[in-house]
């Protein structure tokens, strides 16, 4: 009678645990990177919306000799033929608390405030990557004097 040497093949429990830990680490790293990319994309969309509002406000100033009192002047459907018209899908009117309590739900949320002397305006948007509100000024708007909404 001959005996066969049977070699146990397979993985030990320790080897399986090591593989599971490595997979978990890779998952966490990829999720963190993905969230960072999402925040960069949202910030880019918010900045684009703010740039669009700033450009349309300048066009409004050229056509009407004053800056719009609020975003509604730029998004008025009755003015859709005007060069300063801004589609409501492009921008969402909103306000930001200082400091911001929470990020806006929509990336294209913009706060627009015309200056008291109507020679410029402040356009604010949320930077999702840095969790802060950023501001862009159009025209010759003094930093501390704003009115309207």
Language-model regions: role of each:
Residues 1-11:
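N-terminal leader/signal peptides at the extreme start of proteins
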Residues 11-21:
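N-terminal signal-anchor/signal peptide hydrophobic helix marking the start
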Residues 12, 29, 44:
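Conserved Walker
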Residues 21-22, 49:
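Residues within membrane-spanning alpha-helices of integral membrane proteins
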Residues 23-41:
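C-terminal juxtamembrane segment of a hydrophobic transmembrane alpha-helix
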Residues 39-67:
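Membrane-proximal N-terminal amphipathic helix
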Residues 62-130, 148:
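Extracellular/periplasmic head regions of type IV pilus-like filament subunits
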Residues 129-149:
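Short, low-complexity, Pro/Ser/Thr/Gly-rich segments in the mature regions of secreted, periplasmic
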């Amino acid at each position: 009678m001959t005996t066969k040497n049977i070699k146990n093949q397979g993985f030990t429990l320790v080897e399986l645990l090591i593989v599971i830990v490595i997979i978990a680490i890779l998952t966490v790293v990829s999720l963190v990177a993905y969230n960072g990319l999402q925040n960069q994309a949202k910030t880019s969309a918010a900045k684009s919306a703010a740039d669009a509002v700033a450009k349309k406000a300048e066009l409004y100033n050229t056509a009407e000799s004053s800056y719009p009192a609020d975003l509604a002047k730029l998004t008025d459907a009755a003015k859709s033929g005007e060069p300063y018209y801004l589609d409501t899908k492009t921008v969402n009117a909103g306000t930001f608390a200082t400091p911001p309590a929470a990020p806006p739900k929509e990336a294209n949320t913009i706060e627009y405030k015309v200056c008291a002397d109507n020679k410029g305006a402040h356009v604010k948007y949320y930077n999702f990557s840095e969790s802060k509100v950023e501001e862009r000024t159009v025209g010759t708007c003094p930093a501390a004097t704003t009115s309207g909404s």
